[in-house]
Amino acid sequence: MSSFGYRTLTVALFALICCPGSDEKVFEVHVRPKKLAVEPKASLEVNCSTTCNQPEVGGLETSLDKILLDEQAQWKHYLVSNISHDTVLQCHFTCSGKQESMNSNVSVYQPPRQVILTLQPTLVAVGKSFTIECRVPTVEPLDSLTLFLFRGNETLHNQTFGKAAPALQEATATFNSTADREDGHRNFSCLAVLDLISRGGNIFQEHSAPKMLEIYEPVSDSQMVIIVTVVSVLLSLFVTSVLLCFIFGQHLRQQRMGTYGVRAAWRRLPQAFRP
């Protein structure tokens, strides 16, 4: 055997002795579901499995309550209960001394069950501003929530919320608008959409009850002057007609009763109507 062949054989034997697992297949760990959104205090069934034929050890790591429902050599089925907050479940298996793991992300949500719309003020003059406010109590996660404000079928405003927003607070969206003549015939409403598709959940929607504005035309200064003048003239005519009727009545009475009767009537006349 040549020296080159001898060296090649030596290297091959060394590799077999020092690296016995170099040809060993890499195994995988799977978890079902990979992600899911649940309501508070819910329970969830989780399946952990592996491609390793004879795993040495395996299981599910979580701080929540768990029960092993069933198992075989390559899989374990658990019930996780009392889920009250977002959490990560970790499935793991060890095969030939090597450990692999896979995580399942669980999100806790509360859907929008009540959407409250407020118009302030409800009586608005044409051209004046008013505020539309939408409130949704106790909804989470807020970063998956969007509030839409509508005037009829027109979207006036949409409001999203960042991840930094605290959970289980009241979500609020406001929008300032200017009233026009047609607003008195339009419905205002709010739509809350909680989109949990990216978290392994569904889309939840809730509408507010529709509200309407009372719209009126503002009175200009010149119109106000005309109204005040007309009212003053009418009031003066009314007072004058009352005085004329009184004087005419007393004149007729004087003709019937004489001077004495007129003087007596004059004394009975209130001071306000005397010249």
From Swiss-Prot:
Assembly notes: Interacts with RDX, EZR and MSN.
Cytoplasmic side: 249-275
Pfam families to which the protein is assigned, alphabetical: ICAM_N
Chief site of localization: membrane
Annotated stretches, region: Required for interaction with EZR, MSN and RDX and co-localization to microvilli: 251-275
Molecular function in Gene Ontology: integrin binding
UniProt domain Ig-like C2-type: residue ranges: 41-98, 127-197
UniProt function note: ICAM proteins are ligands for the leukocyte adhesion protein LFA-1 (integrin alpha-L/beta-2). ICAM2 may play a role in lymphocyte recirculation by blocking LFA-1-dependent cell adhesion. It mediates adhesive interactions important for antigen-specific immune response, NK-cell mediated clearance, lymphocyte recirculation, and other cellular interactions important for immune response and surveillance.
Organism: Gorilla gorilla gorilla (Western lowland gorilla)
Segments on the Extracellular face: 25-223
Signal peptide (residue range): 1-24
CDD domains in alphabetical order: IgI_N_ICAM-2
GO-annotated cellular components: cleavage furrow; microvillus; plasma membrane; uropod
Protein name: Intercellular adhesion molecule 2
Membrane topology type: Single-pass type I membrane protein
